């Protein structure tokens, strides 16, 4: 995770009380999210859907479903 993103994760952990380690973003997860963001922007023809889809995936991820499975689900609805 780059420095800028790491600082935001630190701040979010402080404010929410979430364990900081839960906010770590692996390179693989970052790639999955960036791919999903690109998919949302291109598939919907609206760039604004990219961060919104990533938010929805993040909320869905709290149920414990792996990120790659969520990505497959999102892509299969296109």
Regions found by a protein language model. Give the residues of each.
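Feature captures hydrophobic
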Residues: 1-78
């Amino acid at each position: 995770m780059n420095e800028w993103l790491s600082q935001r994760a630190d701040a979010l952990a402080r404010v929410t009380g979430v364990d900081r380690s839960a906010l770590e973003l692996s390179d693989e997860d970052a790639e999955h999210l960036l791919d999903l963001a690109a998919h949302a922007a291109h598939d919907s023809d609206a760039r604004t859907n990219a961060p919104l889809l990533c938010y929805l995936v993040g909320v869905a991820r709290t149920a414990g479903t792996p990120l790659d499975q969520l990505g497959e689900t999102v892509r299969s609805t296109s």
